[in-house]
Regions:
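Conserved residues at beta->alpha junctions
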Residues: 25-26, 90
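Alpha-helical scaffolding within the catalytic cores
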Residues: 69-74
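Conserved beta-strand elements of the Class I
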Residues: 20-24
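C-terminal accessory helical subdomains adjacent to catalytic cores in phosphodiester-
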Residues: 2, 6-18, 33-57, 75-87, ...
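Phosphate/oxyanion-binding active-site loops and adjacent basic polyanion-contact surfaces
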Residues: 27, 31, 59-68, 204-208
Length: 220
């Protein structure tokens, strides 16, 4: 991790007036690949995106509580300005309501923290670039939400659907640029799914990653 002095020097020299967006995610590669590509596509001198990576010792620790700890550690080490943002990007499918509630409560109590949760997982956000989930039958929407494997050897349903739509998909290697050309559609579709935006996270099929995408694109 960069020293406090090097980060402050970077901000002073290259991003003097930039709003800092720091992203920590449950996934090791998927979110990093996507948001690096999005930030490059929407390069703006007033926005600087920094994506945290887990150390080798932390590779298998992806719980929301650990992702939140990454952001808290960052906040303690570096001086943040009033318009900076710390974003927690997590999935719903693997975690208990109690854990998510604790994390959501802590985020709500911190002016810098924002939680972008996908229900069931980040692949929903990626799929929304290519598919309008609101046009699916109730039965298909339920399959998306349940995101089951058809066997032990197959991927979860949304990964298989994403591979069908993209032609090729692996969480550590995929064509993010293909998706980003449709990011405006993804945002509109995610908003349409977000029936109760005041809830702490989507209780049904939905993703709040669109809020982070809008921030990276400087649509605030």
């Amino acid at each position: 991790m960069r020293s406090r002095n090097s980060l402050m020097r970077e901000r002073q020299e290259a991003f003097r007036d930039a709003r800092l967006i720091v992203i920590a995610s449950e996934g090791k590669d998927t979110e990093r690949i996507y948001f690096k590509a999005l930030a490059k596509e929407y390069t703006n001198p007033r926005v600087h995106v920094h994506i945290l990576e887990r150390s080798e010792a932390e590779q298998n620790n992806s719980s929301p509580e650990h992702v939140l700890k990454q952001l808290n550690d960052y906040k303690e080490q570096y001086a943040l300005e009033a318009d900076d943002e710390l974003w927690l990007v997590i999935d719903k499918d693997r975690w208990t309501e109690a854990m998510l509630s604790r994390v959501a409560t802590e985020c709500a109590q911190d002016e810098y923290m924002h939680m972008a949760l996908s229900n069931p997982c980040i692949e929903l956000w990626l799929l929304l670039h290519l598919v309008d989930a609101t046009s699916l039958s109730p039965e298909e929407q339920q399959r998306w939400l349940e995101n089951r494997r058809t066997s032990r050897r197959t991927d979860p349903y949304l990964k298989m659907r994403l591979r069908q739509e993209m032609g090729s998909y692996h969480e550590s290697a995929y064509d993010a640029q293909m998706l980003i050309t449709h990011v405006e559609e993804a945002i509109a579709r995610a908003k349409a799914l977000d029936k109760n935006p005041t809830d702490r996270w989507p209780q049904t099929l939905g993703t709040r990653v669109y809020l982070l995408a809008e921030s990276v694109m400087n649509r605030k």
